[in-house]
Structure formats: structure tokens, C-alpha cells
A protein has these predicted regions:
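Acidic, surface-exposed loops and disordered segments
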Residues: 1-172
Length: 172
């Protein structure tokens, strides 16, 4: 297990993966990390997860989100708005879950990429159709996290993004 500061400082978007399969135990840990994210009210978190390993399905989604095509596994995060306590904050709740998942991936020696789906309705509908999501206004595909062992040259590594000029105190 890596040091938390190291995880934060080395997480980056991994777009190329080794062909090695991601172990189910690691996928489960990543899902558990996502479910530990804060929501608008305990027990009212909107997230649901769809694990995709089938190469044909990944290729179909890849026609819309090209980075999904060659990933060993993808997880579609689906918001079930009906479950969210404050209906207007579902995207924040889903974002918290997604980042927890990406951080846990680094902790487990994996790389991940957040592929945005929402809020573009056409893209949300097309991806929902590919995976057989029921046509329900309360079910919203939010993002797709691709996971895998980083390909050579794509390892998680420190990239200094700190810019003091972006920090303000008391007033802008």
C-alpha cells in the first residue's frame, strides 16, 4: 500500500495500458473506495456501477469515447437520481466517488482515466443504449473510468501542478 501523499502526487490520467488483466479483487476494492465517497446524505448516494470487460462492448463504447477501446476494464458510473437526497448535487456526489476510485487504482498499482459522459445528453443516451441501461430519466451515465496496468512510459508519476498564483486569501 502506498503513502497517501504519494498517491495524491502521482495520480495522473493513464491513457495506455498493458494487456495484463485486472484482477477482480482489485476491481472490488476500487468499487468499495467509490462507495466510501461522501454523498448529500448517508444512505442516499446515487451511484451504481457497471463493470465492462467484453472487448466488443468496449469497442462500441470506443466509437464514442475512443480511450475506452483498448482498456482491460471499464467501469461506467451511473447516477440513480431517484436515490439522491438533494437531486441537484448528483454530479458532485458522482465526482467524489470517481476520484476515490481513481486514487484507489493508484494505491493498487493500476492506472485509470476519467472519461466524461455527462452532461452531454446524446452521449449519455448512446452509451446507455450500448450497455442496455433502461430508458429512465432517473438513470444517468456519468463517466467511464478505464483501468489497467499502465503501459511502458505511462506510469503514474509526479507532475508538479502547484501554482501559488491561483491561491487567494480573504478576497479575490
Amino acid at each position: 500500500m502506498a503513502d497517501f501523499e504519494e498517491i495524491i502526487n502521482t495520480r495522473r490520467s493513464i491513457r495506455e495500458y498493458d494487456a495484463k488483466e485486472v484482477e477482480d479483487e482489485k476491481i472490488e476494492k476500487i468499487l468499495k473506495a467509490g462507495m466510501q465517497a461522501p454523498g448529500s446524505r448517508l444512505g442516499a448516494e446515487p451511484w451504481e456501477f457497471l463493470i465492462i470487460k467484453n472487448k466488443e462492448t468496449l469497442a462500441k463504447i470506443g466509437e464514442i469515447k475512443p480511450r475506452v477501446t483498448n482498456a482491460p476494464v471499464a467501469i461506467l458510473l451511473i447516477a440513480n437520481i431517484e436515490r439522491s437526497f438533494y437531486k441537484l448535487v448528483w454530479q458532485q456526489e458522482m465526482s467524489a466517488a470517481a476520484e476515490n476510485m481513481l486514487l484507489e487504482a493508484v494505491n493498487l498499482g493500476l492506472g485509470g482515466l476519467w472519461n466524461g459522459v455527462a452532461p452531454e445528453e446524446e452521449r449519455m443516451n448512446a452509451i446507455g443504449e450500448i450497455v442496455g441501461l433502461p430508458k429512465d430519466e432517473n438513470l444517468k451515465p456519468f463517466c467511464i473510468i478505464t483501468l489497467g496496468y499502465p503501459a511502458e512510459g505511462w506510469e503514474n508519476k509526479f507532475m508538479d501542478k502547484f501554482e501559488e498564483s491561483r491561491i487567494h486569501y480573504e478576497t479575490y
